[in-house]
Amino acid sequence: MTKYQPYTVQDVKDSSARELFTVVSTFAGGGGSSTGYRLAGGKVIAINEFVEEAIKTYSTNFPDTKIVPGDIKTLTGNDLLKAAGLKPGELDILDGSPPCSAFSVAGKREKGWNKEKSYSDGMKVENIEDLFLEFIRIAEEIQPKVIIAENVKGITMGEATKKLNEFINAFSNIKPGYHVTYEVLSAANFGTPQGRERTFFICIRHDVADKVGIHMFNANQTVFPNPITPEHISISQAFENLVNDPEEEKMLEDY
């Protein structure tokens, strides 16, 4: 039986201390994707987020990471590079998870495109799907070695594929040139007790790809991992070793 491997915040910090690669994260939220990079040995040196509660959560867990607050539409790549202490082309990974409600199979999809919507904290945003293009603009200004973006599975379905192709073309046009790949991955195949499917884009700068032997004909097979867990882990398996500590309990007062 596959065993769930829990980790602590200290585990994340210890792994990140290896500093195997550098990361700047946009749409960083409370630090979900940043945690993954840290567990892989990465150093997340700066992030962008504009929801105040998410910023508080992030800074509590990772106080050493520089936070560039604000709407990504008002930021430049130089703002993030300055916070990271890097020049264009030096960053290893630029990460981003632009809002995805416009493409979700649970949402209105194309009926909701080009309309005003409420974002994370209730803020009204026009054309929320275009925030993906703002992320690509930042990527073009930073010119990282690798660009990683995440979105819902629905972006690969139906009318949304028009937007998918628009994003792929935009990634492809970033100078000095990138190999653009995407794949739908399920978290359940990688040790997480959740059947969460997401579309991942991984774009590798040509000079970096050449050094490690990645070319357009083999990019998808080379870049994306195979499932690591032969059996999916259930919630009950993940919870079975949790310690019931009454001192750690906190009652929700405002309900």
Language model regions located:
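Core alpha/beta nucleotide-donor-binding catalytic domains of modification enzymes
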Residues: 2-143, 153-157, 161-162
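Class I S-adenosyl-L-methionine
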Residues: 82-91, 101, 105-255
